[in-house]
């Protein structure tokens, strides 16, 4: 048998891990080939299984690190992936910073390393400009596809009274996790970029409930009992902070974090997480955070995230007249969405009436002249007056009051009345 270890063999990963670990230890022992982050934290060549990433200042330092890494790999009788017949190579260099700085040519096994401005790694696009623009764009495109998958699954599978609960589980497992992977560790994340991700979330709600863009955004979360993506990212970032603080304090990640915490610059991750701690009402004391077990801290963050979500959603609710008749004390799915005596269409209709998105002229007037009821032409066309509309009363036995729809326990008779009213109005159209 040949005296070699194959990459895909049983011992391949162990040999690979040992090799990259040896590189790091040699850098520490020699006190060289380490990038000084903010002139304080030493950043060794980063390694993940068989991937290597060296960080160095342009010039002599980058040339020296390049020679060191290639030499160490060749001494192990290993090779980096150089350009193939199509000119594609897994070995690239990326220049960060001013372009007028001298950036030397780097070689791998005698082959010039191509320069790139971006590189995809583990689902994230690393950009020379340090921005998340393309990452967000990719996540949005991915999210739109996931929304279509979820809606298709819901429409072609019978979930009975569990339809909306299943929909929210699919949202969390497929959509939220699909478009927010690793986002908690991104730096320089802009509010506008978070909003782009949340727009995909809103798209799913609109398709799920068959409502227009003018539907109050907060109604989706308050009625269906879920937390906005922006708040989810805040919670995940704070949980990652707990993970960092639990690491060995002499380690590279912890050293990098402390350096950034003590000397922050605009867009740094530590600035984002400090704002998250403030928003969620969690003390920024390292001692306090470390004192909590992983599970206890996770539960604390979950509770605080719900409180914060409720607070910001209620602020939005107070700015919308359409939501004035609804009251919320916590983030939870409203009872009518889980009832077994209501059809999916009846639940969607209830949502529209509760949020004043039902098809009445006054619900969509937006500053225009008053709209008159198309049936009797004797009153303003709004959903409240539909219960006393002469034309409707001649065709439907009205039981209950329109205000019943804003209660926690909505009578079945009231739901049936608004369904019949909607059917009559649709026939008139």
Located regions from the model:
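Conserved pre-motif C helix in the palm subdomain of viral-like polymerases
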Residues: 2-33, 175
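Conserved, non-catalytic sequence blocks in retroelement Pol enzymes and Pol-derived host proteins
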Residues: 4-16, 37-38, 57-60, 130-138, ...
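Catalytic palm subdomain of template-directed nucleic-acid polymerases
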Residues: 43-75, 97, 128-131
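Basic, alpha-helical interaction scaffolds
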Residues: 49, 110-187, 243, 251
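Short, conserved micro-motifs composed of acidic
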Residues: 82-117, 138
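Family-specific functional microsites
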Residues: 152, 157-160, 315-429
